[in-house]
Design a protein with these regions (language model features):
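N-terminal signal-anchor transmembrane alpha-helix
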Residues: 1-31
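Membrane-water interface at the C-terminal end of transmembrane alpha helices
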Residues: 5-17, 115-134
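Alpha-helical transmembrane segments of multi-pass integral membrane proteins
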Residues: 12-13, 47-49
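Alpha-helical transmembrane segments of multipass membrane proteins
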Residues: 16-25, 56, 60, 84-88, ...
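Internal alpha-helical transmembrane segments of multi-pass membrane proteins
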Residues: 38, 61, 65-83
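Non-cytosolic membrane-interface motifs at loop->transmembrane helix junctions
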Residues: 38-44, 99-112
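Canonical alpha-helical transmembrane segments
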Residues: 50-66
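Membrane-helix boundary connector in multi-pass membrane proteins
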Residues: 89-108, 126
């Protein structure tokens, strides 16, 4: 039911994404073998999730303003950004100080955070936001 403002839809996306990512964190982080790894801390997950949702909401507002079919365009942009968001995770071992000690399972978990956030955010913004009045 499309009845919310972008702001409310973004808040729903934010809460849903944070909850999903924290569930993933608490279930799977112990299996990664990574201790004291800031991206796998609750605060790190919350901060990076909030940044992603905030950025997506801004992009959706812009796309919605200028596109005749904002849902399709935003979904495509989101898919491209999701794939690009994997690059820092993939290259973390080479780029970060101490990254060579990062486990593959930790990197996969970071990618899972991106996917969960993207799915929830795209759904909330495109399905819950009221149509733009011209």
């Amino acid at each position: 039911m499309k009845t919310h403002s972008i702001f409310v839809s973004a808040l729903i996306a934010l809460v849903g994404s944070i909850v999903a990512n924290l569930v993933l964190l608490f279930i799977f982080a112990p299996l990664t073998g990574m201790v004291n790894f800031p991206p796998l801390s609750a605060s790190g997950v919350i901060i990076f999730t909030a940044a992603g949702v905030f950025g997506a909401a801004i992009v959706y507002a812009i796309v919605r303003r200028f596109s005749a079919n904002p849902t399709r365009l935003f979904t495509r942009i989101s898919a491209v950004v999701l794939v690009l968001s994997f690059l820092p995770d993939i290259f973390f071992r080479q780029l970060a100080a101490g990254g060579e000690n990062t486990t593959s399972s930790a990197i996969v978990l970071l990618m899972a955070f991106h996917v969960a956030c993207a799915v929830i955010t795209v759904w909330a913004l495109t399905r819950l936001t009221a149509p733009r009045i011209s």
